[in-house]
Amino acid sequence: MFCFPRTGGRIAVWLIGHSFIHRARRRAAVKKPGLQLGFPEGKVGVHWFGVRGMRWPGVWSTLLQKVKAGRRPDILVIHAGGNDMGLVPQKDLVTAMKNDLDRIRRMFPDIVIVWSEMVPRLVWRHARDGQRIERSRGKVNKLLAAFVRKFNGVVVRHKVLEEKLPGYYWKDGVHLSDVGTDLFNLALGEGIERALGRFDGGSWQA
């Protein structure tokens, strides 16, 4: 696999994930601080790649598609895996996630990866036992968080959403409401800010 060196100019922040990212972008477009999540456009470029229904393998394929178009991220935010719960054995899912994160790091040795943990759902569509899936979600999050931190990545916990208040969700019990999405975007912004602090010694603020 080729390594792609960073080009000059703005720090490129990419957000890749399933419908949560798709809906988060749509919400950010109509609510302050906007699609840039409050970061200065002159120094940071925030790019959203949300694909509804995306399962974990889509992270790698989406990344490759964008890279082949001549672009590359400096900071990569990933929110995916939730649509695989109940369909892929936990061990297999964790292995696939770790392997892909390693591939990404080989492609971009200087990248900062931000792992956005899977948030709870009131309804798990592919599960006979929702509580069992919730326990598995917690285990996967814990394992991936530890893995990402080993290579100085950033973990976004979404602690407020762990309260699972009905008002945080859309009527389907899967997707987040406007309130829930605002909280989701706030946490993503905080995670990106931490990643920027590790990038170029925080020179983006200068």
PLM regions and their residue ranges:
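Serine-esterase "nucleophile elbow" of acetyl-processing enzymes
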Residues: 1-52, 65-68
